[in-house]
């Protein structure tokens, strides 16, 4: 269940669900890899997530073995810990139970979701970090690219509620689209999440429309510069993903 991730800003991760109901069409790298290696047959199968029922039992075995080498555990990299909708309550409950178990072993957890962050998370370790993905405020973009995810306004509201209760929060603005995919003002997104402690920014990959945009490299360079300046002025920490900035 627990494994060391190769993601640049990650340590350990866990993915206690196969598939994701959000069905992102950026495209989704996790879906592409699972399909390539035969773990998922189709997009429809991917959008019908299967919970690993013995997640907590696996953690009981793995935590004692790995505890001393773990800095933090991220939920999740190939699925979502808080999928949107009443049909996925069990997934969210398992996510909270897993975080509790990791916290009991004094392991910090980092969460990222396109769903709604439950307010119960505020009762867990104050070392945890809770995040949401926001790459556009457009409901039409969400409908096309993140069809099963929570409305962006609801995501932000759930993050703000945790922030107001003293939790550490962060926002992933990745994969950020070029204007030929979604014309928008990055500043509007930043202003909506200006309360957060940390922002991660990254370009959109694996979508041919990105490279069709004239000067897409310069576009991402400028947006990264804008993020850095915005965060510096407001004392927000930020991280620009590798290969977002080009020279």
PLM ranges: what are they?
Residues 1-21, 25-72:
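N-terminal [4Fe-4S]-dependent radical SAM core
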Residues 2-3, 7-22, 143-145, 151-152, ...:
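Non-transmembrane, interaction-prone segments in cytosolic or luminal domains
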Residues 47-50, 88, 234:
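Generic alpha-helical secondary structure signal
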Residues 55-226, 230:
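Conserved AdoMet/S-adenosylmethionine-binding subsite of the radical SAM
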Residues 113-115, 175, 233-247:
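Acidic carboxylate-rich catalytic motifs and surrounding loops in phosphoryl-/glycosyl-chemistry enzymes
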């Amino acid at each position: 269940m627990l494994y060391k991730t190769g993601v640049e800003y990650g340590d350990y991760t866990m993915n206690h669900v196969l598939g994701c109901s959000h069905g992102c069409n950026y495209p989704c790298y996790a879906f592409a890899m699972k399909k390539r290696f035969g773990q998922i047959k189709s997009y429809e199968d991917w959008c019908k997530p299967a919970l690993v029922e013995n997640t907590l039992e696996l953690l009981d075995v793995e935590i004692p073995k790995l505890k001393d080498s773990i800095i933090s555990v991220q939920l999740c990299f190939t699925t979502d810990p808080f999928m949107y909708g009443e049909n996925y309550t069990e997934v969210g409950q398992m996510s909270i139970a897993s975080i509790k178990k990791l916290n009991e072993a004094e392991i910090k957890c980092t969460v990222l979701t396109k769903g709604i962050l439950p307010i119960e998370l505020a009762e867990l370790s104050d070392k945890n970090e809770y995040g949401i993905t926001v790459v556009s405020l457009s409901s039409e973009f969400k409908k096309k690219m993140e069809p099963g995810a929570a409305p962006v306004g609801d995501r932000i509201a759930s993050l703000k509620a945790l922030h107001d209760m003293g939790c550490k929060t962060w926002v992933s603005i990745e994969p950020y689209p070029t204007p030929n995919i979604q014309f928008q003002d990055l500043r509007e997104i930043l202003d909506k999440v200006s309360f957060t402690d940390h922002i991660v920014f990254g370009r959109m990959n694996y979508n041919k429309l990105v490279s069709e945009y004239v000067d897409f490299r310069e576009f991402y360079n400028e947006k990264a510069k804008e993020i850095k300046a915005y965060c510096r002025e407001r004392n927000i920490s930020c991280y620009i993903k590798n290969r977002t900035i080009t020279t």
